[in-house]
């Protein structure tokens, strides 16, 4: 599950990186984006555009928007069967640009009860999945309501984690390189999801960060800085 992420790249730079246009009012950069917050997404096929949506999908058929915080992720394995998502795959695909995301791992600490330690994941500059310092997460979007009461929202697709990422968490966002991104944002209504969601042991930076990120009200650059963690079993890949 991907439950928190960062986005501090300005809208104009996101538009340039993903060959999109934007007329959006700048959303405040954030180092601790939680569910239901407003985020940028890239939509469109040939004519891409940056749009502002709420993170946490509210299906068009919902009675209200109360389910938003529970639908921040959609599993690749079941997205084609779930009523909330299956009809969105053909034409309501989007990309969620993030600078990084957080996951938590139960870590044994010397002399203390084990606790959940947050880790920060970001793109290695050498990686083909790095888009000018950003990761591109495959997403789905929709709009709830009618008339003056409209609520546009999105969800992030998740998949089985690669070997490296699974040391922290068994799931990961469905990340896109340039080729997969172009296919995901294309007008093709019959994309091969299985082909796009193949786990690739991509280059990604992972390091432990402060537990201050646990509180969504904390929001500054210190949240993504590397910290030292005393542990009885070292995390050999970090």
Predicted features along the sequence, with ranges:
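Short linear sequence motif anchored by a di-proline
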Residues: 1-238
């Amino acid at each position: 599950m991907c439950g928190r992420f960062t986005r501090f790249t300005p809208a104009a730079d996101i538009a340039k990186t993903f060959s999109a246009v934007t007329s959006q009012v700048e959303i405040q950069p954030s180092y601790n984006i939680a569910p239901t917050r407003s985020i940028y997404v890239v939509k469109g096929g040939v004519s891409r555009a940056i749009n502002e949506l709420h993170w946490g999908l509210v299906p068009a058929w919902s009675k209200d928007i109360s389910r938003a915080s529970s639908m921040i992720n959609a599993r690749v394995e079941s997205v084609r069967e779930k009523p909330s998502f299956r009809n969105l795959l053909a034409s309501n695909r989007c990309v969620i640009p993030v600078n990084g995301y957080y996951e938590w791992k139960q870590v044994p600490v010397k002399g203390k009860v084990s606790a959940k330690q947050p880790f920060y994941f970001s793109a290695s500059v050498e990686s083909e999945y790095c888009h000018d310092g950003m990761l591109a997460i495959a997403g789905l979007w929709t709009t709830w309501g009618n008339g003056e009461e409209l609520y546009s929202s999105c969800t992030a697709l998740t998949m089985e984690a690669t070997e490296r990422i699974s040391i922290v968490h068994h799931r990961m966002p469905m990340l896109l390189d340039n080729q997969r991104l172009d296919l995901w944002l294309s007008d093709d209504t019959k994309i091969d999801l299985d082909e796009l969601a193949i786990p690739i042991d991509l280059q990604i930076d992972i390091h432990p960060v402060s537990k201050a990120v646990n509180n969504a009200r904390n929001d500054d650059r210190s949240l993504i800085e590397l910290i030292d963690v005393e542990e009885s079993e070292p995390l050999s890949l970090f």
